A protein has these predicted regions:
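Charged, cofactor-coupling segments
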Residues: 29-145
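Active-site cores enriched in adjacent His and Asp/Glu residues with nearby glycine-rich loops
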Residues: 1-41, 64, 69
Length: 145
């Protein structure tokens, strides 16, 4: 689906075609209640400010993590037909994208996994007793009961 130098593709923002959203955000008592304070106050600080590049501008958490913070970790991959068509028509990122192959995924939709993470003194801890199945074996075992 992609070609060329990975670092150059990321620097150009090519990944935003597949993940035009942030990777996660702060959590309060509810999943999104911290957003009402304004992302600039919650997800950023005086040292770290938002970036205005498409895709990267959707990052909602850039501040230094501290013990006691609870954040979401939400990697995802989407194939948004209108966005694919727009980028292809404009010839965007053609040095990094293989549009003919991407076209075959337009009916896929997308998927996003989410974990809620507690930041501790020594690292982090995934909250909750069970993760969603993510490997092929885990998904098949879940489907087959």
């Amino acid at each position: 689906l992609m070609k060329g130098d990975v670092n150059a593709a990321v620097a150009a923002g090519t990944h935003a075609l597949f993940m035009p959203h942030g990777l996660g955000h702060m959590m309060g008592l509810d999943v999104h209640d911290m957003e009402d304070l304004g992302q600039i106050y919650v997800g950023y600080d005086d040292e770290t400010r938002p970036i205005d590049q498409f895709g990267t501008s959707s990052l909602r958490m850039g501040r230094k993590l501290q013990p006691g913070f609870v954040v979401t970790d939400e990697p995802g991959c989407y194939f948004i037909p209108a966005l694919i068509d727009q980028w292809k028509e404009q010839g965007l990122h053609k040095d990094f994208l293989v549009y003919d192959k991407i076209e075959t995924y337009k009916d896929f939709g997308g998927i996003r996994l989410e974990d809620d993470i507690l930041i501790t003194e020594n690292g982090c801890k995934c909250m909750g007793d069970h993760r969603a199945p993510i490997t092929v074996e885990e998904v098949e075992n879940t489907i087959n009961g």
